[in-house]
């Protein structure tokens, strides 16, 4: 019952990403906080991406999720991303923080780490975002991550 509920909430592609994340955590004996950080980044990127092109929207969740891969494997992110079958745009967004998806990810990471002073106002305006957008996206990410955590506890 909770699995079908999860599929309704997340969609099948998100379930695959989430299952991979959970598996990584169990295999590598990583703290729950890493899973939370990964999901928070993914959902915050997803929420903010609605102001962007369809291409950015499609990559944003994955970019947020993949941006913590180095912590999961204790290996440099750039090396890990080279071996994954990903588009150059997604790879560059995660590793180099280039393109709109990369810039979005950069802002999300800084916001989540309370590095607000390192988010240039002109970068936000170029992306068409405001601090209120970031705050709303953060609240959204918390709510979605909490939903996932509750589903995991039910299992």
State what each model feature region is.
Residues 1-155:
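Conserved alpha-helical "signature site"
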